[in-house]
Amino acid sequence: MLEELKQKVYEANMQLKEYELVVLTWGNVSAVDRKKGLFVIKPSGVPYDKMTADDMVVMSLTGEKIEGKLNPSSDTPTHLELYNRFPEIGGIAHTHSSWACAWAQAGRDVPAYGTTHADFANGAVPCARGLTEVEVNGEYELNTGKVIAEELESRGISPLERPAVLVHRHGPFTWGKDPFKAVENALILEEVCKMASRTERIAAFDKDSDIGIEEYLLEKHYQRKHGKNAYYGQSEEN
């Protein structure tokens, strides 16, 4: 069942290791088949070097395990909540990459300080609130998804304009049209978090530093890559 999608999800998960976004068995990637109402996700706690495409677990969008000999990722309810809240999302990645986690642990949005960030997201990457004790001791992973969705909705942000949210004291979740785009966004997020950290470090030692991107420059860079009249890259005909 969903053999092609399982292969894609497997390959996307292996990219987490290739890009050094995870260590040990941390992290997970999933992808959804909207027509069939199913999604595929990495199994829980399986070493990347021992994992195969056949190990990927098929879940329904109502939360039932449909196929797989292994348990799905413990973060499955988070992925499920995001797929159900945002139909435009086709793939989700969760990592514990160092720089993104540092910002999450600090409970800070990642400001847009330059055009690299603007090419990725149309504004600051939000850091969602921490979960309450009741939320943690209840359906923790499901509530994590609800907190992410709450953050986007409360700020009036489209998930495709801001393809990442940090969860306070936890880490980053990213998404995209497919699992490979979700992983790409996780990689870009790690880089912009690193750049933002270094920018603030430099600025702390120089009172004349001028940090923060102008709105018109941010908008230009975002729209030329992602807007209706985007002209970055090659057309589909090329």
Tell what function each PLM region has.
Residues 1-238:
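Glycine-rich flexible loops
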